[in-house]
């Protein structure tokens, strides 16, 4: 199971970046009141851009921990080191998405985050949308919700694929929009999903 990073780098990076990014990208946010102030919750968002994991924590008033593909933590060279340190500072946890037992380890990591009363950010599609459309989600989020009892807050991200298209390092300055929906609760036995 992956080790969950400490909150100090996250808090420091957030304090530094938030004023700059809020001023530059002027996020328009609806429904933020649906994110509980305490206790476990799952923020389930569409995934349009690398920058989704940066913009959402800017507006959510509590720490959001994401499950991120392990390749972000293992790239070689100076760029790889900077990328790894940035992802750790952003509160992201590396997970191997290759399937089987590795996928199980990712779910257990998510359950540990929720058991600690934290907020878990997840992209149900499992990867970025190549064209801005919403694709079929995977079942891991349902399992996390049913096994933890945590509410799922649906989140819609808009414009981030235009701000930072796949493969682009430098984002364009454009207004980002986010909408948080009402919490959803799921019950049942997650073993029935197989």
Model-derived segments and spans:
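A cross-family acyltransferase "interaction/gating" segment
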Residues: 35, 130-192
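Short, basic, glycine/proline-bearing loop/turn elements
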Residues: 16-18, 89-97, 124-127
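Helix-adjacent hinge/juxtasegments
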Residues: 93-116
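A transmembrane-helix-recognition feature enriched in membrane-embedded lipid enzymes
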Residues: 1-30, 34-37, 62, 77-90
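Catalytic-site beta-strand/loop segments enriched in glycine and acidic/polar residues
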Residues: 111-141
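Short gly/ser/thr-rich secondary-structure transition/capping motifs
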Residues: 22-30, 102-104, 160-162
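Catalytic core of membrane glycerolipid acyltransferases/transacylases, capturing the structured
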Residues: 37-100
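Hydrophobic/aromatic ligand-binding patch that stacks against planar heteroaromatic rings
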Residues: 55-56, 86, 112, 143-147
């Amino acid at each position: 199971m992956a080790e969950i990073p400490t909150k100090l780098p996250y808090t420091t990076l957030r304090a530094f970046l938030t004023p700059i990014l809020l001023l530059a990208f002027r996020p328009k946010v609806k429904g933020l009141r649906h994110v509980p102030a305490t206790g476990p919750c799952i923020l389930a968002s569409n995934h349009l851009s690398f920058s989704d994991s940066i913009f959402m924590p800017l507006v959510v008033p509590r720490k959001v921990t994401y499950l991120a593909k392990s390749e972000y933590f293992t790239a070689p060279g100076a760029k790889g080191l900077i990328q790894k340190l940035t992802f750790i500072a952003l509160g992201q946890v590396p997970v191997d998405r290759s399937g089987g037992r590795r996928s199980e380890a990712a779910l257990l990591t998510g359950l540990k985050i929720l058991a600690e009363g934290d907020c878990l950010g997840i992209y149900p599609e499992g990867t970025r949308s190549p064209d801005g459309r919403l694709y079929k989600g995977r079942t891991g989020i349902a399992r996390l919700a049913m096994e933890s009892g945590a509410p799922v807050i649906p989140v819609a991200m808009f414009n981030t694929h235009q701000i930072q298209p796949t493969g682009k390092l430098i984002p364009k300055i454009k207004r980002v929009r986010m909408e948080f929906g009402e919490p959803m609760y799921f019950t049942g036995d997650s073993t029935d999903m197989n």
